[in-house]
């Protein structure tokens, strides 16, 4: 089982996302389960190591968002066109 630490995003938009990526983080979103969607930021180095395993895409993951655990599954992953970097992940509440 994978556990990922996340923080709620304070800023939205293209400029804020670019600043996150320069700080070795990237944006993500959590939705589903009759709850509000939550925009989060993830540490790239932590997630890229997990993402290389097949179980990352099929298992239920635990997101720790500001100290609160949420069970999620990966819905979609966006990657940089030519760099080995993640650009964005969509998580669906399990």
Curated annotation (Swiss-Prot):
Q: Which SUPFAM superfamilies match?
A: Ribosomal protein L25-like
Does the keyword RNA-binding feature in the UniProt annotation? yes
**What would be an example GO MF term here?**
5S rRNA binding
GO CC terms, sorted: cytosolic large ribosomal subunit
- Which top-level group of life is the source organism from? Bacteria
Keywords for the protein's UniProt record, in alphabetical order: Ribonucleoprotein, Ribosomal protein, RNA-binding, rRNA-binding
Detail the disulphide connectivity of this chain as listed in its UniProt entry: none
Q: Name one GO biological process term.
A: translation
Q: Matching Pfam families, A to Z?
A: Ribosomal_L25p
Functionally, this protein is described as follows: This is one of the proteins that binds to the 5S RNA in the ribosome where it forms part of the central protuberance.
Family named by the database record:
Belongs to the bacterial ribosomal protein bL25 family.
Outline the subunit composition.
Part of the 50S ribosomal subunit; part of the 5S rRNA/L5/L18/L25 subcomplex. Contacts the 5S rRNA. Binds to the 5S rRNA independently of L5 and L18.
NCBIfam families assigned: PRK05943.1 (NF004612)
**What is this protein called in UniProt?**
Large ribosomal subunit protein bL25
**Species name for this entry?**
Photorhabdus laumondii subsp. laumondii (strain DSM 15139 / CIP 105565 / TT01)
